[in-house]
Amino acid sequence: MELNVTTKDNSSTIFSFIAVSIPVLLGIFVFMVPFPHTTTIKEICFYLSVSLVVVLFLARKIKLSFQTPLAIPGLLFVAWCFFGLFYAVNPANSIHDFYSHLVKYIILYFIVVNFFSSIRKLSILSWIIICSATILFVWRLYDFYVILGNPLATRFGACVTEVPTNLIGIIAVISIIFSITNIFQAKDWLRKIIFLSVLLPAFAVIFLTQTRGALLALFMALVSLLSGRIKILVGILLLVGGILLVSPAGERFTNDVTENVRIKQGLLVWEVVKDYPITGIGFGMQTFAGNLDLQSYNEKLSEKFRRQEILLNPHNMYTDITVRTGVPGIILFLGVMFSFFRMMWRLKQNGTNGSIASWATAVFAAGIPFFVIGFFDPVFSHYPESILCVVFAMGTVLWRIHEENKSSMKV
């Protein structure tokens, strides 16, 4: 995005300052995402960014672009969610969450796409994510194992509310992916060592939380990222496998999955879906626990599952979307997912230069943890939504650079 300033006077200086301020504010927002008691700072950064974009747009100093391969599937999903508001069980909660957990992040997505419009800016954005995650990991690990005195065999938990234990693996895997990418791209040893050092707390968090979803997401993301560097991939996987063999995390894969309460919850959610198959119960996240008679749905299950605990949310991203937006809603959401990964796959294979292909590989891998961990846990909260929004935006920026390069080659 280029600022449309033709004269150098006081007003042009002000507009230039505003344009520079927007990515700074967004950078602060992204950095603060996982930290507690920073809601005010994040809200100020977000709404101030939106206001400044509006000022520049109304003054005709910028031309916003909304071109993206995600536009059509995304618009269809948003339109269906909006349509479902008219049939929501709890309209107030659904309207609130429709804005807070969907529209707001679409706005954030397009601002990031328009103001982080170069490979250099994407690199800086990845540094912000890595730095924020590393500080969070070191702080929480130190607090849990040193200050509180828990032994290392104790499952890492008691995380801040913005980052529950089961979801911290999302940012940990993304931090690892971006750190490895920056190691490959760094030209000096100092930078390589810095990015190498931040891998330790990220890996520690994944193993100490002992969550199957995070471990599976790590495996799949590493395979995706390093498929072209087989020796490095094999070395890392052997190291990860060795740690699993001697750590309590390995025992998580030997537990009897048939006793997992998530199976019962999936069956219970299916009973709800059968009553609301088209538009779902509404987009509101509190509707499932607050407005449905879950005990009556529990009575429809077999005796084995009736005895198990009733969870207050679907505990799975895909069943969560299905119960809130109906069967058409989950189909449209899967369409958004497919469009994102197809876009990244094409850039991996046919990027107009090595930087685009390299970053497309990283962003493809960075999208994996959200959708893998989503099989095991409810991931729709502001922290993972913000990260997913940024990852989608990074992918779109790469697509735009690729398209611009193709156009310039034809001239």
Question: Which sequence ranges carry the predicted segments?
Answer:
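Hydrophobic transmembrane alpha-helices and their immediate junctions
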Residues: 325-368
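Extracytoplasmic loop-helix module adjacent to an early transmembrane segment
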Residues: 48-52, 262-276
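Interfacial transmembrane-helix termini
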Residues: 30-49, 63-70, 79-105, 114-124, ...
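Transmembrane signal-anchor hairpin modules in multi-pass inner-membrane enzymes, especially those
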Residues: 1-93, 117-123, 127, 182-193, ...
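Long extracytoplasmic/lumenal interhelical loops at the membrane interface
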Residues: 254-267, 282-325, 347
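Transmembrane alpha-helices of multi-pass inner-membrane enzymes
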Residues: 47-54, 231-232, 363-411
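Alpha-helical transmembrane segments of multi-pass inner-membrane proteins
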Residues: 29, 50, 78, 82, ...
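Transmembrane signal-anchor helices characteristic of membrane glycosylation enzymes that use polyprenol
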Residues: 32-35, 242-251
